[in-house]
UniProtKB/Swiss-Prot annotation:
UniProt lineage: Eukaryota, Metazoa, Chordata, Craniata, Vertebrata
Post-translational modification Phosphoserine, affected residues: 37, 44, 60, 86, 106, 119, 133, 162
Chain positions found as N6-acetyllysine: 17, 107, 117
Leucine-zipper: region residues: 80-115
Protein name, as recorded: Elongation factor 1-delta
GO molecular function: cadherin binding; DNA binding; DNA-binding transcription factor binding; guanyl-nucleotide exchange factor activity; heat shock protein binding; RNA polymerase II cis-regulatory region sequence-specific DNA binding; translation elongation factor activity; translation factor activity, RNA binding
One Gene Ontology cellular component annotation held by this UniProt entry: cytosol
Alphabetized UniProt keyword annotations: Acetylation, DNA-binding, Elongation factor, Nucleus, Phosphoprotein, Protein biosynthesis, Transcription, Transcription regulation
CDD domains assigned to the protein according to its UniProt record, in alphabetical order: EF1B (cd00292)
Family matches, as InterPro entries: eEF-1beta-like_sf, EF-1_beta_acid_region_euk, EF1B_bsu/dsu, EF1B_bsu/dsu_GNE, Transl_elong_EF1B/ribsomal_bS6, Transl_elong_EF1B_B/D_CS
Feature: compositional bias, Acidic residues: 149-169
Length: 281
């Protein structure tokens, strides 16, 4: 029963042989020998095409004389003729490029020859040697005898520096004078006065307080170094408004405590005084 089943079953028992053959084939194709042969074939492809074209031309010439020439061979010959024509055109263009290169090389050689011929004529001539006469001994000039007038001038030289002492005294006096003038000039300049800008909140007792009268009372305060500025009424609540007034004071003359004391003297109108803002100018 088992043998009958194996007889009817399609099993490929020789598959390993085909696998080995395929592996050897690809190894030969990818090996170094195959690569070298492909390089040689690629290098000589043009020569083989030319040789094949010549053979086909000779065969076509021999076959065209006979009556049994077929139409298929004539088509192949036409393709070969076109291929040969393109190769001839490429060959002519390469020849033209080679000729141009040869002409350029010949021009360069001629230029080099001209430069080599002209270089010896431009060599710098060696400078002529100058004859130097032997050294002669030079005698020093004879000293003239000193005259009495020159002796008197030498006697006038102050060896102890008395003139320098007088010049030092004059320079010290000049320096002191300049310092005194600078001090006087600096004293005449007005000294910088430190000032501050103060924003006051003056609050009344109730909504029945006359705010115009309150502002008049505040502005009636006149102090040295105090300048009143702008003012406005700011609502507080329940119909009550406070007086917000700005002033500029000199820090050395007017202080915030003094301002508060002077404003709170108006007890009938003023309840309290607060400093809302304080900035140095």
């Amino acid at each position: 029963m088992a043998t009958n089943f194996l007889a009817h079953e399609k099993i490929w028992f020789d598959k390993f042989k085909y696998d080995d053959a395929e592996r050897r084939f690809y190894e030969q194709m990818n090996g170094p020998v195959a690569g070298a042969s492909r390089q040689e074939n690629g290098a000589s492809v043009i020569l083989r095409d030319i040789a094949r074209a010549r053979e086909n031309i000779q065969k076509s010439l021999a076959g065209s004389s006979g009556p049994g020439a077929s139409s298929g061979t004539s088509g192949d010959h036409g393709e070969l003729v076109v291929r040969i024509a393109s190769l001839e055109v490429e060959n002519q263009s390469l020849r033209g490029v080679v000729q141009e290169l040869q002409q350029a090389i010949s021009k360069l050689e001629a230029r080099l020859n001209v430069l080599e011929k002209s270089s010896p004529g431009h060599r710098a001539t060696a400078p002529q040697t100058q004859h130097v006469s032997p050294m002669r001994q030079v005698e020093p000039p004879a000293k003239k005898p000193a005259t009495p007038a020159e002796d008197d001038e030498d006697d006038d030289i102050d060896l102890f520096g008395s003139d320098n002492e007088e010049e030092d005294k004059e320079a010290a006096q000049l320096r002191e004078e300049r310092l005194r003038q600078y001090a006087e000039k600096k004293a005449k300049k007005p000294a910088l006065v430190a000032k501050s800008s103060i924003l006051l909140d003056v609050k009344p007792w109730d909504d029945e307080t006359d705010m115009a009268q309150l502002e008049a009372c505040v502005r009636s305060i006149q102090l040295d170094g105090l300048v009143w500025g702008a003012s406005k009424l700011v609502p507080v609540g329940y119909g009550i408004r406070k007086l917000q007034i700005q002033c500029v004071v000199e820090d050395d003359k007017v202080g915030t405590d003094l301002l508060e004391e002077e404003i709170t003297k108006f007890e009938e109108h003023v309840q309290s005084v607060d400093i809302a803002a304080f900035n140095k100018i």
